[in-house]
From Swiss-Prot:
Residues 65-143 are annotated as: Domain II. The keyword Cytoplasm applies. One of its GO terms (cellular component) is Holliday junction resolvase complex. It holds the Pfam family RuvA_C. This is Holliday junction branch migration complex subunit RuvA. Homotetramer. Forms an RuvA(8)-RuvB(12)-Holliday junction (HJ) complex. HJ DNA is sandwiched between 2 RuvA tetramers; dsDNA enters through RuvA and exits via RuvB. An RuvB hexamer assembles on each DNA strand where it exits the tetramer. Each RuvB hexamer is contacted by two RuvA subunits (via domain III) on 2 adjacent RuvB subunits; this complex drives branch migration. In the full resolvosome a probable DNA-RuvA(4)-RuvB(12)-RuvC(2) complex forms which resolves the HJ. It comes from Sphingopyxis alaskensis (strain DSM 13593 / LMG 18877 / RB2256) (Sphingomonas alaskensis). GO terms for molecular function: ATP binding; four-way junction DNA binding; four-way junction helicase activity. Its main location: cytoplasm.
Length: 199
């Protein structure tokens, strides 16, 4: 499981960058905002990552901040929102703007992203409206965000590492966290989340 990379920015292209870590180049897909934040080629960078594993693919997605990765996981928990659409939304909107749009039910703002039609934007807004405040994206330092970066985030990463889609992993861990409470350990979260995901 690769959660973070620190190395030299080897190249920066459309929709992806290559990070050289000890002579190994990691191809990392990312939103336009993250790619802009990486700076000039040749510079030292740190990028938070999410690994997607499938039968015939292995993809590494990169995020400038851990909170952007948390929002990616939340977005992909919505049916019809895959990695490509989630990255398009994060390219079109700052995390704070995304949170405000969801909290206010402004689906038109979500629909600004490439590949997001009105119906999908409405579904995203409807399903995530009540969850928008949980990540604390406007300040970037709310208690729920720090919790998501701890055992909850680690449990989601563990499930995606086992081959679950980010959306499935997020939903299963959220259900496990609700059942076990805020003080749940990583082991307990993963164990219960696996049972939830298997249903």
């Amino acid at each position: 499981m690769i959660a973070k990379l620190t190395g030299r920015l080897d190249s920066n292209g459309a929709g992806h960058a290559v990070i050289d870590v000890g002579g190994v180049g990691y191809l990392v897909e990312a939103s336009a905002r993250t790619l802009d934040a990486l700076g000039a080629v040749g510079g030292e960078v740190t990028i938070h990552t999410e690994m997607l594993v499938g039968e015939d693919f292995l993809r590494l997605l990169g995020f400038a901040r851990a909170e952007e990765r948390d929002w990616f996981r939340l977005l992909t928990s919505v049916q019809g929102v895959g990695a490509k659409v989630a990255l398009a939304i994060l390219s079109a909107l700052e995390v704070a703007d995304l949170q405000r749009a969801l909290a206010s039910g402004d689906s038109a703002m979500i629909a600004r992203a490439n590949g997001v039609g009105p119906k999908l934007a409405q579904r995203i807004t409807h399903e995530l409206k009540d969850k928008a405040g949980a990540l604390g994206g406007i300040s970037g330092s709310g208690p729920a965000l720090s919790a998501a970066a701890g055992p909850v985030g680690d449990a989601i990463a563990a499930l995606t590492g086992l081959g679950f889609k980010p959306g499935e992993a997020s939903a299963a861990v959220a259900a496990a966290n609700e059942e076990l409470g805020a003080d749940a350990s990583l082991d307990a979260l993963v164990r219960v989340a696996l049972k939830k995901a298997a249903k």
